[in-house]
């Protein structure tokens, strides 16, 4: 099944931006990149493009080079231009997030079109699109690098499509059980008494507060071992003083 999302770069002049754009779309789960009349016809092989693509060399290699925007939009049913300012006679302008809320459920094959690094999109190219996206930014300086703009649009579109889950902890990490955490807490109490930081005759609320701190940290078993190892080291050095 063809990728229903396409990213189109119009006449990109810097190979590094092409590589960085390939990386930007890959990390958001997309892979269809089309280049319209790039300055360097062999830009996919350029060392700067390859360097900035990093692990996305496959997207860069598959990128298609075409002569016109019409070719780039073949098979696309909804094209979104990108521009800092709306055009007087162009398509309606939206912030990406606002437009994507409805576009994500439309079933369209979507293309996002980006202009040149220096001049952005020409009016005639904007007029070929169904909507124009403007990334909200500082009024006095809202110009983004090409690859940065691609990253923002790719991220917002992925979020509109459901996004990716963020793992709450390191993969395969095993949380320490209550006995292990309490053992670490008891060990630290002895160590703090040993170095004179905690007065057992007037402990106040130090240990309950440390207990809460460890609970919030959701320690793994390995982290408990580290804490106890630190306490043992402190005990050993104190014993030699």
Language-model segments: residues:
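Post-transcriptional modification and biogenesis factors for structured RNAs
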Residues: 1-241
